[in-house]
Amino acid sequence: MWRTRWEDGAPTFTRNDEFLYCHTRYETFLRVMGDFQGIFECQYSADVLRDWVRNHVDQVLSLGIPHNWFLQVRPGSTMPELRDQLLDDVICCPERLIVLGKCVIMVEDHYEETELVLCMGGGTRLYIYEPSQEILLLCARHLDELARYGMMYTEAVYRQPQTPFATRVPHDVVAMLLRHGHDADALAACVGEHHGRDVNFHTPGRHAKTLKLLTSFGCLTDCWPFEVAPAARLAECEMYVTLQLRCRWYLLGAVGSYRAGGFFDTSFLIIFDRFCRFYVVIVKSHLDRSPPLQRLAGEIYRLADSLEELFRAGLMKVYVRRRYEHGLRRAARLERNGGCVHMGEAARLHFTMFDSGVDRDYARQFRWLCRGDRFRAEMLNNWDGWDAFTIWQARVVRGDFAERRRPRSLGDGEEEDEGNDGRAMPVVRRRPPPMPRDDDEDNHVVPDNQNLEVIHDALADDEEQGEDDDDSGAEPMEPEENNVVPNVERRGGEDAVAARMAAGHESDDDEWEDLGFDLEEDTVFDLKDVDEWFEQRRLAEKERWHLGQRIVNAYRTEAEVSEAEVEARRINLNTDLSPEWVKSFDFREHFV
């Protein structure tokens, strides 16, 4: 495999390393789906699913990845560790969970039982409950994801000693670090001995990144973007990390990649505290992703509880957010908050892949998921895009789609269309045309009957007077000045309306409430006030700096402190931390 030849040179990838390129083979996919077929078809009822679990006790089901992980079917009534646990307080939203059994690991020719309990929620969501930490881990969003990727997203897998290490090379450096991984001071000294060495930091299912070992925080000046930061800003970044951890800590190294110019581009920092708990510091923001996957510069959260877990899981907790626990416990451990999987209920498996007419036909869904043309060896990502294309091809090209129109009963004189394969053509109903209007119909308003005779007589008198004037042959009378309407008066209505509107605006201005200040006067700034504001801001920054320096020195020099006390500090003090500290890691202007 290429990652075992790291000393000969790292491979070059032309694609982004954020996608998950690893998945199971088609044979493994079918084996997992076949083992969980009974559970998949019983998901419509919780009682039926519980009966299935009771009827298949001690049956072993494959979990895909890792290849030696299995599920031993067992009801929840046989597990005493679940009797006093309220899982509704842990999960983000209320959801009914049904216990399926415990996870076991095949070692040589026998099974070793773990404490991990597998539960199923709505839509075949699978959760792992870890009693020692009282947390819920989202194992898979649905059964199809479990068959494709197994348990690679589950962080509890990497806490088991049977799980192999993903980070192995260079062998001498990794072996030396693991030897001193339980003592913080000894581990920091070991990192100093191998200062500048590159470790092939591998995450299961992801492409490898380079972990450059660094002795102290000041050595970051050799890496981008810290080499452009002044000494004061670098010290502020160090103080911010100390104020987040609330104890003494050490730097393990910087995670990133080498650029064409030869410089090392840093994306993350890996640090560990005095209790050998490992954390990640985000340096490069990732805002072009969905909200559950966004990462902001300056965020600090726990990556692993030990160095062994770190070299097994890598940056898995950076890429996924699937841990659910109590809020105080999450704040004490600096864990990343898990995303809510109940917001997109419309994106469930049977809504995205199947027709609405078969959304409860689980047997048909199972056959569709296990079809033979779903897997191809050249597919590097997953099958989601090909599933959408398959639906389009099956429904449009082949005509294999469900008829959801209600059958129409034939009326009198109607016959079924023979050219439509026995299906009745829909009848297009049109609105009736408007009624024709009679020619003799009078469209104008007719006056009242009482005034009809008066109007008729007046019209007759006018006609007679006009005939007399024509017979007399007199010259037409010129109009008087008072009878002439000038053009200005013809537009008088419009001008009057405009004048009234202008007068109305003036009256509104006069009726405005006095606000107590002059707008024109306030537009002129007093330079003394501006200088005073900047002086106050400078004094506040100076006070914040001195206060942070005193707190950091106190944390560094304390001799003994328990982990519980440090966690209590994080719960009580991190909420009042000034947001100005996190801005020290904002290097967006230095990233392209």
Curated annotation (Swiss-Prot):
Superkingdom to which the source organism belongs: Viruses
UniProt keyword Zinc present: no
Membrane-spanning segments: none
Subcellular location: Virion tegument
Protein name (record): Tegument protein US23
Compositionally biased residues, Acidic residues: 460-481
Record-linked InterPro entries: US22-like
Predominant subcellular localization, coarse grouping: virion
Keywords on record: Virion, Virion tegument
